[in-house]
Amino acid sequence: DIGRDALSAVLCAHDGRGDATSLTEAVEKKLGAAAWDAIPMIYRGGKRLIASLAPLVFAAAAGGDAVSCGIIARNAEHLAGLVRAADGILRRDDPDAVCRVVLGGGLFADGGIYPALAERVPRGVELIRADVPPVYGAFCEATGDEPSPDVRGRFMADYAAAAAENNG
């Protein structure tokens, strides 16, 4: 949603429905065209293109852009609502238990949305940033245990090579 919100903010700034934002220049530079003119390209690029705009929001927010800060706050609040709902279900029978939530994906790496999310989750929730891809959990389940560091290293190397090949 962050990339989509960035596009919306840029288009709203363009037509006067929203505040000016440094996202406009950043998004248009990435798209290689004015956002208004790039709409057909955005549709062709789909979710992957839209998601690729999220880092621009984090960079603009770090630079003090109020619109970007608002995008991060709204998305963090949405995620925190999901965490609160899960927490309420998982700790229903044991309110003193710790609810561990594993966060995976680029949004949670190197700052991203993590700080805004962490300040919004209830006490007793432990946020864990995954340093492995989600498929690693399936790998561990299939092997029946947490693999040794050597096996983990080979898995990660093979995964990185496959990801590079698929994205190349």
PLM features: residue spans?
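Loop-centered beta-sheet repeat module
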Residues: 1-5
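ATP-binding/phosphotransfer module of carbohydrate and carboxylate kinases, centering on a glycine-rich
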Residues: 7-168
